[in-house]
């Protein structure tokens, strides 16, 4: 369908040579807009869903004043932040102070270029998609470091130091999780990783969800879920912005749209790591049962991603914040050894007669 639309548009503008030559660029811009605009809307309404779900878990109503059922609350919040003054600290490094939020939001949005929403539905279907996601998202920590240093505030700098140490530490465990998935899939292409999960005895029996990677790679699945919570600095790993000690961490000196961009980066990263979990471990757009195959794949992808994102909020409502030394110990002394052992286990499993990924 996507190819048909592209070819139709190409034929439509072919009459003018310069428009025809520019059509691939125009087409890519259209695809980028079709990904980014819904993503920004999803980020905005994720804030509302978080507040509503936390309210339900804490036996209160949550936002319910702006619009019917509070549905216009994200728009009101966006307008409020847009109209607030962007205050720059007197001793801040001006250029770097404004570069920090940009460095944080760009990787969170840029990594979506290789995320597939269906078998033939991706902005860029590249063979090294998983590697590209890892490379792009690792840049986000530089935005945090720059923001903390450029603010010329001890609280912001301390938050940036914590963030950089925590994100780098858990990136190692997360990278090993990626390696295990690459080993069993035989590819770094995200579309192929989903396709591999659609094969097997259980899929032939109509129980496709038992062929997904979450079951044979369950320890890796759990390590990945916990690692990405730490990677995006979400509760209970949010010592980076621990309200009781360093207020908002690296964002403490930001106001208005500067603060809003950091906020957008955090929630866009939540959607990103959630859809990656679905693609790598939960079958992507594949239905759990063959009987439900009539439902479009992008709907299944959306449902699964929404459930994983809701898990982030559930964790926030359930667990107390960990101490910083506990977070570092978990990453270095538990997760990295566990993932290394599982790399060896899966390697031996793939070479054994009981290889289920053939």
Curated annotation (Swiss-Prot):
Localization (cell): Cell inner membrane
Coiled-coil stretches: none
Origin superkingdom: Bacteria
Keywords: Cell inner membrane, Cell membrane, Membrane, NAD, Quinone, Translocase, Transmembrane, Transmembrane helix, Ubiquinone
Transmembrane segments: 29-49, 95-115, 130-150, 176-196, 206-226, 258-280, 297-317, 334-354
Annotated Gene Ontology cellular component terms: plasma membrane
Entry annotated with the keyword Transmembrane: yes
EC numbers for this chain: 7.1.1.-
Entries under InterPro entries matching the protein: NADH_UbQ_OxRdtase_su1/FPO, NADH_UbQ_OxRdtase_su1_CS
Catalytic activity: a quinone + NADH + 5 H(+)(in) = a quinol + NAD(+) + 4 H(+)(out)
BP GO annotations: aerobic respiration
Presence of keyword Membrane: yes
GO molecular function terms attached to this record: NADH dehydrogenase activity; oxidoreductase activity, acting on NAD(P)H, quinone or similar compound as acceptor; quinone binding
One Pfam family from the record: NADHdh
Membrane topology per record: Multi-pass membrane protein
Subunit structure and binding partners: NDH-1 is composed of 14 different subunits. Subunits NuoA, H, J, K, L, M, N constitute the membrane sector of the complex.
Family: Belongs to the complex I subunit 1 family.
Main function: NDH-1 shuttles electrons from NADH, via FMN and iron-sulfur (Fe-S) centers, to quinones in the respiratory chain. The immediate electron acceptor for the enzyme in this species is believed to be ubiquinone. Couples the redox reaction to proton translocation (for every two electrons transferred, four hydrogen ions are translocated across the cytoplasmic membrane), and thus conserves the redox energy in a proton gradient. This subunit may bind ubiquinone.
Name this polypeptide is given: NADH-quinone oxidoreductase subunit H
Organism from which the protein derives: Acidovorax sp. (strain JS42)
């Amino acid at each position: 369908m996507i190819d048909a639309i592209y070819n139709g548009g190409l034929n439509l503008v072919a009459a003018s040579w310069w428009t025809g030559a520019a059509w691939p660029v125009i087409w890519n811009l259209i695809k980028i807009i079709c990904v980014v605009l819904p993503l920004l809307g999803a980020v905005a309404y994720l804030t509302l869903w978080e507040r509503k779900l936390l309210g339900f878990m804490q036996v209160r109503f949550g936002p319910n004043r702006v619009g019917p059922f509070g549905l216009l609350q994200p728009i009101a919040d966006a307008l409020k932040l847009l109209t607030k003054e962007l205050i720059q600290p007197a001793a801040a490094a001006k250029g770097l102070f404004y570069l920090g939020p940009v460095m944080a939001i760009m990787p969170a949005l840029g990594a979506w270029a290789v995320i597939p929403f269906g078998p033939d539905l991706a902005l860029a279907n590249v063979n090294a998609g998983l590697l590209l996601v890892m490379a792009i998202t690792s840049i986000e920590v530089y935005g945090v470091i720059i923001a903390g240093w450029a603010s010329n505030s001890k609280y912001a700098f301390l938050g940036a130091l914590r963030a950089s140490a925590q994100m780098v530490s858990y990136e190692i465990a997360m990278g090993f999780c990626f390696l295990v998935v690459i080993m069993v899939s035989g590819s770094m292409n995200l579309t192929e990783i989903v396709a591999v999960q659609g094969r097997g005895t259980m899929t032939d029996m109509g129980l496709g969800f038992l062929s997904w990677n979450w079951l044979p790679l369950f320890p890796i699945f759990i390590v990945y879920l916990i690692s990405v919570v730490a990677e995006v600095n979400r509760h209970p790993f949010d010592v980076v912005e621990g309200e009781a000690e360093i207020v908002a961490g690296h964002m403490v000196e930001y106001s208005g749209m500067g603060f809003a961009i950091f906020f957008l980066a955090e929630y866009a990263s939540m959607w990103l790591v959630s859809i990656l979990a679905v693609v790598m471990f939960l079958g992507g757009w594949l239905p759990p049962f063959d009987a439900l195959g009539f439902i479009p794949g992008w709907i299944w992808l959306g449902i699964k991603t929404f459930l994983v994102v809701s898990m982030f909020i559930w964790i926030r409502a359930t667990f107390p914040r960990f101490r910083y030394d506990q977070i570092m110990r978990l990453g270095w002394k538990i997760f990295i050894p566990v993932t290394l052992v599982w790399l060896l286990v899966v390697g031996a499993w793939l070479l054994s007669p009981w290889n289920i990924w053939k």
